[in-house]
Amino acid sequence: KNKHQLNYDDLKKLITEKTKLIIINSPSNPTGSVTAKDDISKIYELCREKGIFILSDEIYSRSVFKDQGEFYSPSMIDHCNNNVLILNGFSKAFAMTGWRIGVAIGPKHLIEKMGLLLQTVNSCVPPFIQKAAIEAINGDQSAVRMMTEEYSKRRKVLVNGLNSIEGIRCHMPSGSIYAFPNISGLGMTGEEFVDLM
């Protein structure tokens, strides 16, 4: 009913004294929705007031379709100095799937703790992957734009095709590589639908 958009008032009601972190995934996996700038700003203010951290998963931040709005990061407010932590990677935008390289940006004390944890989990990302990641970020971005344009075309074909099937409704995703159809009009469970496919 709300195109998979986060409802700020509902979120606010769920926060208790135990809430330490809110995760924002925009563009979203699996719905493809992009959280609006106004909602990001309200969530940031709420979290700042209550001493809650925001972890913003921005793996699809470069995959927002031009006709569907813009991506907005809470880091634009906080610059990752206080209560915002950004996670991003190279697998989606730069087709570096399986290379296992990403980036975390946040308050110094959190990044230091993450670094200690990472030392025990993963000894080292191979140097050639690190160099490729630097080139991906600093180099020509035309391939990223071309991929996003192609995904936008495919998204339209997929969603229009899904919506042409009686009993299926699907909102046009704003970003990422996902579509999230509602099959409730088919009168079957998700498992039954998958088995039928």
Regions found by a protein language model. Give the residues of each.
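PLP-dependent class I/II
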Residues: K1-M197
